[in-house]
């Protein structure tokens, strides 16, 4: 149960694995949180790394879905004609997520902006849930990759991408990716990313050796968001 009265600030971004969370995904009419609308929202509730519940619905955006969006997500006007509006869906989604940490791919730059906007617009609520962006984790685990799209990660791990770009399918794909990224971060994965690396006690990201005026020191990889340092 989320306490609506207590939420006066947005949750923070975490850069670590958590075993209990709701992984969610939105499909939209376009890429702008200023002008575009949600047309599908899905989520999977996870406990101890296992999916225990699902949430998924199409959403009527009250406008025509551009061809370019339909070409990507295969959602067309006739599919959402009888779907509920997002204003009706949000209280149901809020009940589903409760106080859980939210997880998703590229959500810091995209999905969270839509959620923040619409929770404030329709419910007068500042969403307080902390969140983890698997794109950020992928940058930590695979710093040399050129692209870290969800499909790239799924292909790397041998996870099926059939049905990609529909929200619930993407959620299930991303959930498997998140669990495997978690193993990478703990040193149990396909590559030991923690070799010779410490973890920042402040934000959970990796510490790396940096050079300063007075020689080498440990600095958080989350810099400039996190400025924690340690002497070597």
Predicted regions and their residues:
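Conserved beta-strand -> loop -> alpha-helix junction used to position metal-binding or nucleic-acid-contacting
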Residues: 125-138
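Short metal-binding segments enriched for Cys and/or His
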Residues: 224-232
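Short cysteine/histidine-rich zinc-coordinating motifs and their immediately flanking basic loops
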Residues: 211-217, 231-232
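Short cysteine-rich clusters marking metal-coordination/redox-active sites
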Residues: 200-203, 220
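Conserved non-catalytic scaffold segment of RNase H-like nuclease domains
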Residues: 2-116, 120-128, 143, 147-165
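Short, flexible, mixed-charge glycine/proline-rich loop motifs
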Residues: 185-197, 210-213
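Residues immediately within or flanking Cys/His clusters that coordinate Zn2+
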Residues: 151, 197, 217, 223
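Acidic, divalent-metal-coordinating active-site segment for phosphoryl/phosphodiester hydrolysis
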Residues: 166-179
């Amino acid at each position: 149960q989320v306490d609506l009265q207590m939420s006066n600030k947005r949750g923070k971004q975490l850069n670590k694995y958590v075993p209990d969370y709701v992984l969610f995904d939105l499909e939209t009419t376009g890429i702008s949180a200023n002008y575009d609308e949600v047309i599908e929202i899905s989520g999977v509730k996870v406990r101890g790394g296992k999916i225990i519940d699902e949430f998924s619905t199409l959403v009527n955006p009250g406008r025509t879905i551009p061809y370019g969006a339909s070409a990507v997500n295969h959602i067309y006007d006739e599919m959402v004609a009888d779907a509920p509006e997002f204003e009706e869906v949000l209280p149901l989604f809020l009940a589903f997520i409760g106080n859980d940490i939210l997880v998703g791919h590229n959500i810091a730059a995209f999905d969270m902006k839509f959620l923040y906007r619409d929770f404030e617009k329709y419910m007068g609520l500042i969403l307080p849930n902390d969140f983890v962006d698997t794109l950020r984790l992928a940058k930590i685990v695979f710093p040399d990759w050129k692209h870290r799209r969800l499909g790239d990660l799924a292909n790397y791990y041998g996870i099926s991408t059939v049905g990609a770009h529909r929200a619930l399918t993407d959620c299930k794909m991303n959930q498997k990716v998140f669990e495997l990224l978690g193993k990478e971060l703990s040193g149990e994965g396909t590559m030991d990313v923690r070799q010779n690396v410490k973890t920042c006690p402040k934000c959970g990201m990796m510490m790396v050796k940096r050079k300063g005026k007075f020689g080498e020191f440990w600095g958080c990889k989350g810099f400039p968001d996190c400025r924690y340092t340690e002497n070597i």
